C-alpha cells in the first residue's frame, strides 16, 4: 500500500465513528494512519503473529466489544467441495513456458511469484522455491555444481528489477552457466499488481520510457539475450533450446501481458468433439478453462475435452498443444 492513499483514508475516516485497521503481522498501515492524526486501532485488538482467518478476526472483535457475543450461524460447505491444486489463471502468459519446461525436463530454479505454480501438477517443472531473486543465485550454484544437463531459472519482470539484476551481474562476472528466463507479464501479479520500471507508468501516475530488460541484461554483460512471444508455444520452445545450448550465461525474455493487465479477452476457444481424440494433452496445459466433457471416445472410453466459455480468454495455447487441431476459435468451429 504505497504510496498511502491519504485523501481516501481521510474521507473514509470522516464518515465513521471508529477506524479499525485489520492487517497481518506488523502494524504497518495502522502506524501510518495514526501518524495522520486519525485515532485508529488495530494491534490492540488483533494478533501480531500468524495468519488472520475470518473466525480469528470475529473472535478478536467480540473480545474487544466491537461485535456482539453471538454471531449468526453459518454452514461450512468447504468439506464437500472437491479439492484442487492452485493453477495459473486462464490466459496466463507463463503457461507456455512451463509446458515446454515440463517437456524438456531440465532442472529449474525458482524464487517467489505466480511462476511458483509451475512447481505443481500438471507441470512439475520448477524444483526450488525461495525469496525474490533467489532463483538466479541458485541457478549460478547449479552451474558450478557440475550438473550434466543445462539448467534454467524463472523470475518475473518485477522481481528481476527488484532483486534479480545483482545476482545476474554476479553470475556473468564469475563466468557462470545457465539460462535466466525473465517472464515479463508487465506487472507483479501475485502480490498485488504493483508496477515496475519495465512499464510506462510511474508511482505518481505519470508516464515515462520503460526500462528495456533486454538492454539492461546486455549492459550486465550477457551476450546471449533472446525474446519470445509468451503465447507462441513453438517460439518459446525454440528460444529455450537455443539458450540452453549456449555455453555461458543466457537470458530468455518471454513477453505477454498478465490477463489482469490487458483485460482484453479474445473470443473463447471451442473444441470440435468430432475431431477430439481424448488424448488429454490439452488438460496438461493446466488451464482451468479446459475441462473434461461428458462425451466419450468410442475406442478408448476416455472423456473428451471441452472449454468453459465463461472463463476462457482465447489465448490460444491449448490450440497449439492439441495434436489433431481439434481446438479453434469460434469462427472456425
Question: Where in the sequence are the language-model features?
Answer:
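Active-site diphosphate/adenylate-binding microenvironment
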Residues: 72-136, 145-148
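Active-site glycine- and acidic-residue-rich loops that bind
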Residues: 53, 78, 86-94, 158-162, ...
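Iron-sulfur cluster-binding cysteine motifs and their immediate structural context
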Residues: 28, 269, 277, 281-306, ...
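General beta-strand structural signal in soluble alpha/beta enzymes
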Residues: 21-23, 40-43, 68-72, 108-111, ...
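Terminal amphipathic helices with adjacent charged low-complexity linkers/tails
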Residues: 2-71, 329-333
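Thiamine diphosphate
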Residues: 119-253, 263-267
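Short gly/pro/ser/thr-enriched loop/turn and capping motifs at secondary-structure boundaries
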Residues: 3, 27-29, 47-50, 115-117, ...
Amino acid at each position: 500500500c504505497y504510496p498511502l492513499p491519504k485523501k481516501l483514508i481521510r474521507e473514509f475516516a470522516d464518515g465513521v465513528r471508529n477506524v479499525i485497521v485489520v492487517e497481518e503481522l506488523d502494524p504497518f498501515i495502522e502506524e501510518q494512519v495514526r501518524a495522520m492524526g486519525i485515532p485508529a486501532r488495530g494491534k490492540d485488538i488483533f494478533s501480531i503473529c500468524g495468519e488472520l482467518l475470518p473466525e480469528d478476526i470475529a473472535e478478536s472483535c467480540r473480545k474487544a466489544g466491537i461485535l456482539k457475543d453471538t454471531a449468526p450461524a453459518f454452514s461450512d460447505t468447504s468439506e464437500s467441495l472437491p479439492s484442487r491444486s492452485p493453477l495459473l489463471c486462464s490466459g496466463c502468459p507463463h503457461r507456455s513456458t512451463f509446458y515446454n519446461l515440463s517437456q524438456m525436463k531440465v532442472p529449474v530454479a525458482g524464487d517467489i511469484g505466480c511462476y511458483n505454480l509451475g512447481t505443481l501438477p500438471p507441470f512439475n517443472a520448477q524444483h526450488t522455491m525461495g525469496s525474490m531473486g533467489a532463483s538466479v543465485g541458485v541457478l549460478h550454484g547449479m552451474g558450478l555444481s557440475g550438473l550434466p544437463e543445462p539448467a534454467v531459472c524463472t523470475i518475473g519482470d518485477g522481481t528481476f528489477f527488484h532483486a534479480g539484476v545483482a545476482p545476474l551481474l554476479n553470475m556473468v562476472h564469475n563466468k557462470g552457466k545457465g539460462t535466466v528466463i525473465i517472464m515479463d507479464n508487465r506487472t507483479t501479479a501475485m502480490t498485488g499488481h504493483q508496477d515496475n520500471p519495465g512499464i510506462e507508468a510511474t508511482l505518481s501516475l505519470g508516464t515515462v520510457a520503460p526500462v528495456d530488460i533486454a538492454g539492461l541484461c546486455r549492459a550486465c554483460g550477457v551476450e546471449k539475450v533472446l525474446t519470445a512471444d509468451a503465447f507462441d508455444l513453438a517460439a518459446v520452445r525454440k528460444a529455450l533450446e537455443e539458450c540452453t545450448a549456449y555455453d555461458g550465461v543466457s537470458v530468455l525474455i518471454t513477453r505477454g501481458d498478465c490477463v489482469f493487465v490487458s483485460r482484453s479477452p479474445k473470443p473463447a476457444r471451442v473444441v470440435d468433439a468430432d475431431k477430439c481424440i481424448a488424448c488429454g494433452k490439452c488438460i496438461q496445459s493446466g488451464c482451468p478453462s479446459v475441462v473434461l466433457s461428458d462425451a466419450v471416445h468410442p475406442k478408448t472410453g476416455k472423456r473428451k475435452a471441452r472449454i468453459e466459455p465463461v472463463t476462457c480468454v482465447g489465448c490460444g495455447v491449448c490450440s497449439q498443444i492439441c495434436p489433431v487441431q481439434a481446438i479453434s476459435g469460434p469462427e472456425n468451429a
